[in-house]
């Protein structure tokens, strides 16, 4: 930016008086008296010049421009990239059967407009998820520890929402809606490293990356799978296609059992060749999609990923996580391994806790996570230690739910893809949809 011109009044004070006659000279030389006068004038002019220098205006500092793109790793607040809370919409998909009625119905459109705060929070959370996961897909490489990968994702989510979660109650405003699951190979879900975990991602691993982002309790739950060996591509393609089939089938008044049938048909049309053997891709029949409630990752409705007689209907206003899991193994998972995922139950009965460590930890959980899922690393970063006995007591009392890792048979490979959808009055919005999947 160019320096601004000084005001005319300032310049008039500092300029030499051009109307005053110059002193006479004799034979080209000044007289002694004239010389003395000149010296006096020069002496007077010197401070004036100094004053001019002092009064010279400094160049105004250039204003920092607001960022227009995301950094790598992601650290720019998403709210700065989208002024006035104008976050991108998800993919809007028309309802198949009664779409015309819903789009043209004035009452339905009015209901849609009433949900602006709800939609703004969801779209904000979805944009954070998109930006973080798109960076994660580029940055995750063999040789990284799972702890490094998880913390990179979580630090990015906290930076983009503007809530570090270190002050009491801060994580309840915005941040992680579900701990970063990094489930490898035959482990399908609910694995994240606890403190001290040294596990390293290998070239031949198939890793599910499942994490949630929330803004004001509106949780966006979405997952993808990372594999570096192209032989696993058909497995990933099967699960991605099955998830999209479930999303396509979903809608108001649709029975969840019918969605499961559509998912299974697509999923099990794929095969994958591993070590010269053709293996069918199977839907993991005891894993489901689910509704998402305010500050609660699991609602009361489930969406099977196999054909089912479940007659439960999706309803207007529901928020669903449509997630599918495919496996080269049995297509059935069981609990195995050290627990890392937990959540305080919203329906827990009031219990008189006798263990002081359990009472203290419950207070920490309530004030920092509420009913949002958390993992042990989140408790560690709050400065808590020696809490495991108290945590196990809260689980045994039914106050906190533990979510152990879910595994198929050893030697098998599993994949997962997941999106969050909103069943709005006029349209189905795949809120977490991105250019990546």
Curated annotation (Swiss-Prot):
Gene3D superfamilies: Creatinase/methionine aminopeptidase superfamily, Winged helix-like DNA-binding domain superfamily/Winged helix DNA-binding domain. Residues 10-20 have a biased composition (Basic and acidic residues). Keywords: Aminopeptidase, Cytoplasm, Hydrolase, Metal-binding, Protease. Its cofactor is Co(2+); Zn(2+); Mn(2+); Fe(2+). Substrate binds at residues 190, 298. Residues 52-66 have a biased composition (Basic residues). The keyword Metal-binding applies. PROSITE patterns: MAP_2. GO terms for biological process: proteolysis. Residues 1-90 are annotated as: Disordered. Its EC number is 3.4.11.18. A divalent metal cation 1 binds at residues 210, 221, 418. InterPro entries: Creatinase/aminopeptidase-like, Met_Aminopeptidase_Type2, Pept_M24, Pept_M24_MAP, Pept_M24A_MAP2, Pept_M24A_MAP2_BS, WH-like_DNA-bd_sf, WH_DNA-bd_sf. It is an enzyme of class 3 (hydrolase). PANTHER family: METHIONINE AMINOPEPTIDASE 2. Cotranslationally removes the N-terminal methionine from nascent proteins. The N-terminal methionine is often cleaved when the second residue in the primary sequence is small and uncharged (Met-Ala-, Cys, Gly, Pro, Ser, Thr, or Val). Belongs to the peptidase M24A family. Methionine aminopeptidase eukaryotic type 2 subfamily. This is Methionine aminopeptidase 2. It comes from Neurospora crassa (strain ATCC 24698 / 74-OR23-1A / CBS 708.71 / DSM 1257 / FGSC 987).
């Amino acid at each position: 930016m160019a320096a601004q011109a000084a005001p005319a009044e300032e310049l008039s004070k500092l300029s030499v008086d051009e109307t005053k006659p110059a002193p006479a000279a004799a034979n080209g030389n000044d007289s002694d008296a004239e010389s003395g006068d000149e010296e006096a004038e020069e002496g007077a002019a010197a401070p004036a010049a100094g004053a001019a220098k002092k009064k010279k205006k400094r160049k105004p500092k250039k204003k920092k421009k607001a960022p227009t793109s995301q950094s790598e790793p992601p650290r720019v607040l998403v709210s700065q990239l989208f002024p006035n809370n104008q976050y991108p919409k998800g993919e809007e998909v028309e309802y198949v059967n009664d779409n015309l009625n819903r789009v043209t119905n004035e009452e339905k459109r009015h209901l849609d407009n009433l949900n602006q705060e709800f939609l703004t929070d969801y779209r904000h959370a979805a944009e954070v998820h998109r930006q973080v996961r798109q960076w994660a897909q580029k940055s995750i490489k063999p040789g990284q520890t799972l702890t490094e990968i998880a913390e990179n994702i979580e630090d990015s989510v906290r930076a983009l929402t503007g809530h570090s979660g270190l002050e009491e109650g801060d994580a309840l405003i915005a941040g992680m809606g579900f701990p970063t699951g990094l489930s490898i190979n035959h482990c399908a879900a609910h694995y994240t490293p606890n403190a001290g975990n040294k596990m390293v991602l290998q070239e031949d691993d198939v890793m599910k990356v499942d994490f949630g982002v929330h803004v004001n309790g509106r949780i966006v739950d979405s997952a993808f799978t990372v594999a570096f060996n192209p032989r696993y591509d058909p497995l990933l393609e099967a699960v991605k296609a099955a998830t999209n089939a479930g999303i396509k089938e979903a809608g108001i008044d649709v029975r969840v059992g019918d969605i499961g049938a559509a998912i299974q048909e697509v999923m099990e049309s794929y095969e994958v060749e591993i070590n010269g053997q053709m293996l069918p891709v199977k839907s993991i029949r005891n894993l489901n999609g689910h509704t998402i409630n305010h500050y609660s990752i699991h609602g009361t409705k489930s969406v099977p990923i196999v054909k089912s007689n479940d007659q439960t209907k999706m309803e207007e206003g529901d928020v669903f996580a449509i997630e599918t899991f495919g496996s080269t193994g049995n297509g059935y998972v069981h609990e195995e391994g050290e627990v890392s995922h937990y959540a305080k139950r919203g329906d827990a009965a009031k219990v008189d806790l006798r263990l002081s460590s359990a009472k203290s930890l419950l207070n920490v959980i309530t004030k920092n996570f509420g009913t949002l899922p958390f993992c042990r690393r989140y408790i560690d970063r709050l400065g808590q230690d020696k809490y495991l006995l108290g945590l196990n007591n809260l689980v045994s009392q039914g106050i906190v739910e533990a979510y152990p890792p879910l595994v198929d048979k050893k030697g098998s490979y599993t994949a997962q893809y997941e999106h969050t959808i909103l069943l709005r009055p006029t349209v189905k919005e795949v809120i977490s949809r991105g250019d990546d999947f």
